[in-house]
């Protein structure tokens, strides 16, 4: 009996030991697997952190800002969310923050555009903005005082930031989405107009001059990767120097910058001027004929020096005679001629063109922009009705 009991006990111990060893074996395997996965993840995260270009690429490829636009829509991008209305304090800045909606209303009422044919963009997300902007810069916009400095509307500093995000920065983010989408539309259809955008004073690290996000820089980085564009020309004809995109892209030989601006007004960014490939300075009081002559010469030089696959045209109307900030004396017809010249420049060379409306600080700017777009339609340079 005792002998049998010993054998039984030994058998149980042997079985328990086998189970223990088997359990330990599998536990070690699982631990090694989990450690390996965690290590791979850490390496991957470290790799992403140490390779910002890889992270930028991932963000661009995963973005939803590019989407297919049906042929029932034309290449004009706008959202009612573009317009900024913030308890009336937006009127403290000379910029007409409702001009974008007024441009579209003119085009519709004049019979050149149907509301249902307008393309509405998506809002640029934080991940989209991080393609160019730093986390620190985007976090700085959580301060209403920072946004007040950028928009040059001091009372904004006293409002809760959630209101500032909704009433000021959200419209800007929608316009950024419009600029980025415009490049895709332009490559598909030859041209696209974002009735907004052109925030050419904002760099990756700093906003200013009513420009909170660097939509031109973002648009170009998206185009490089998603559209396989290798050469982009920026034609910046806003009255002010485009120091934002110059700072961000000036040392990139894939980008050629033609900037025609008044050097006697903001932003006086002498460092950024070094990055301009073709600098055309027009002094305060420059009239229409002289301006258009200089533009013709500039476009001729640009066509000899660079062969772009995409043109970003920053078509500010602050060159208009009477504009309180631009200080130039260009007539409304002069702006129409200017826009037509740039569109013909691109059409003759079969280059897709993106137009952004940028600056313009008079109530009459909306009417002038609409008239110019209508002229482009009459000249057959754009098509404002669906095919």
Curated annotation (Swiss-Prot):
Its EC number is 3.5.1.98. It comes from Arabidopsis thaliana. Belongs to the histone deacetylase family. HD type 3 subfamily. It is an enzyme of class 3 (hydrolase). The record marks 361 as: Polarizes the scissile carbonyl of the substrate. Keywords: Chromatin regulator, Hydrolase, Metal-binding, Nucleus, Repressor, Transcription, Transcription regulation, Zinc. The keyword Chloroplast does not apply. Its main location: nucleus. The gene is HDA2. Binds 1 zinc ion per subunit. The keyword Disulfide bond does not apply. PANTHER family: HISTONE DEACETYLASE 11, HISTONE DEACETYLASE HDAC1-RELATED. It comes from the Eukaryota. Residues 73-382 are annotated as: Histone deacetylase. Pfam families: Hist_deacetyl (PF00850). The active site is at residue 201. This is Histone deacetylase 2. Zn(2+) binds at residues 238, 240, 318. Gene3D superfamilies: Histone deacetylase domain (3.40.800.20). SUPFAM superfamilies: Arginase/deacetylase. It catalyses: N(6)-acetyl-L-lysyl-[histone] + H2O = L-lysyl-[histone] + acetate.
């Amino acid at each position: 009996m005792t002998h049998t009991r010993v054998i039984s006990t030994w058998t149980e111990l042997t079985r328990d030991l086998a189970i223990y060893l088997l359990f330990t074996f599998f536990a070690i395997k699982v631990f090694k697997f989990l450690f390996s996965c965690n290590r791979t993840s850490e390496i991957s995260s470290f790799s992403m952190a140490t390779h910002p270009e890889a992270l930028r690429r991932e963000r661009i490829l995963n973005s939803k800002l590019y989407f297919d636009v049906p042929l029932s829509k034309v290449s004009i991008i706008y959202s009612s969310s573009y317009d900024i209305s913030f308890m009336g304090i937006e009127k403290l800045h000379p910029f007409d923050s409702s001009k974008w909606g007024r441009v579209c209303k003119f085009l519709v009422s004049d019979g050149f555009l149907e509301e249902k044919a307008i393309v509405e963009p998506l809002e640029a997300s934080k991940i989209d903005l991080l393609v160019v902007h730093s986390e620190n810069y985007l976090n700085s916009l959580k301060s209403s005082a920072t946004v007040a400095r950028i928009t040059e509307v001091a009372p904004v500093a006293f409002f809760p930031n959630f209101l500032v995000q909704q009433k000021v920065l959200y419209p800007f983010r929608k316009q950024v989405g419009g600029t980025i989408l415009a490049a895709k539309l332009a490559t598909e259809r030859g041209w696209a107009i974002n009735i907004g955008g052109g925030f050419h004073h904002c760099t990756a690290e700093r906003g200013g001059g009513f420009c909170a996000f660097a939509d031109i820089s973002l648009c170009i980085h998206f185009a490089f990767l998603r559209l396989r564009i290798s050469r982009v020309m920026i034609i910046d004809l806003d009255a002010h120097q485009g120091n934002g995109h110059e700072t961000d892209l000036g040392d990139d030989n894939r980008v050629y910058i033609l900037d025609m601006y008044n050097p006697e007004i903001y932003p006086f960014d002498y460092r950024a001027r070094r990055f301009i490939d073709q600098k055309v300075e027009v002094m305060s009081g420059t009239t229409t004929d002289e301006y258009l002559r200089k533009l013709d010469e500039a476009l001729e030089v640009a066509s000899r020096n660079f062969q772009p696959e995409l043109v970003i045209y920053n078509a500010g109307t602050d060159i208009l005679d009477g504009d309180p900030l631009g200080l130039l004396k260009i007539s409304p017809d002069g702006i129409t001629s200017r826009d037509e010249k740039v569109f013909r420049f691109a059409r003759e060379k079969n280059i897709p063109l993106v137009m952004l409306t940028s600056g313009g600080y008079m109530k009459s700017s909306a009417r002038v922009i609409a008239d110019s777009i209508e002229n482009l339609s009459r000249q057959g340079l754009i098509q404002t009705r669906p095919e």
